[in-house]
């Protein structure tokens, strides 16, 4: 079957899926969770095959970490599905209701985007997270995973397909593409695919953005910052920075650059270095940092680099304004955190840093759809159009206007025999 035929099938199925009821969708999600646990041994076996082959092919260590899909990760995705089941169905919610005139009522109502094309590297958990979010939000999904995860992706897509068809979800709502050549053809399928969401490396995402006819939602970089202000609590700062950098390094919300106010740097940097040394983190720093702790020099490129590894660049800054300027110059608009006891400085930081997620006194690792209570996420968007930050169910919806009349025609209003009232109503769409 050609990719255009597969995309057409998903498009057709998405129209029927958009009308599926909440009970049916939740029943399908429950069945997916059940089958994932029942067939976990098959999944782990397939993943071990992918890991072994990828090690032989010298896949980079950060990608190997993302590729691993063991029992703990299976439990995590099942937890995400269970959280998703508990969330309110976002489809069919009335956002606005207006009485245009007597008997003529306008409603703005949420609906699925249609067909979402997901192109992702390494992470099999992304396949489960994204497909279940698409299911709950009523969207069809066309998946293209990396060749390094082909066996894991294949079994996961098979399980999800079987689980949903068993309970009566329209068949063909989900399809997995399996050859590298499919990507470029997929990016031209604007007739069938409504949105592309890429998950992967900087180069990978930029390639998708540069070569797609279809709107792309996502982020190319995860260059996240922590800024330790002069009014910070040192113990708190160390805990937050260590967590932001080392809790899991191979993810887009891990901190890559640390900014430290010059007045607190002599106190906090030596203690912080000891804490990060114990986690085997390599530090590079500016000339002022090197005067305080023994580290290799940071280059201009370091400020622009997403390491996804045990490495952190450190810069001493003169004040809050310099920290904000650095973040807005070198950051990727993903997640940035200030550590301070000053409410005023925190407010300024959170207003002036141009990122989708801005934090005060907490780890950058919190920028995640599951942690935000979204059930899971299809990814992080640094775009300023449609969705920003962790994209959960709401980010997979658009809306349509539904107008109910009783023989109303525009000619009456053009001739001024009738006039518009435009009265706001607090009313749900009745159908």
UniProtKB/Swiss-Prot annotation:
Keyword NADP appears in the UniProt entry: yes
Record protein name field: Gamma-glutamyl phosphate reductase
Class of this enzyme: oxidoreductase
Higher taxonomy: Bacteria, Bacillati, Bacillota, Clostridia, Eubacteriales
Gene Ontology molecular-function annotations: glutamate-5-semialdehyde dehydrogenase activity; NADP binding
Annotated compartments: Cytoplasm
Reaction(s) catalysed by this chain's protein: L-glutamate 5-semialdehyde + phosphate + NADP(+) = L-glutamyl 5-phosphate + NADPH + H(+)
Family named by the database record: Belongs to the gamma-glutamyl phosphate reductase family.
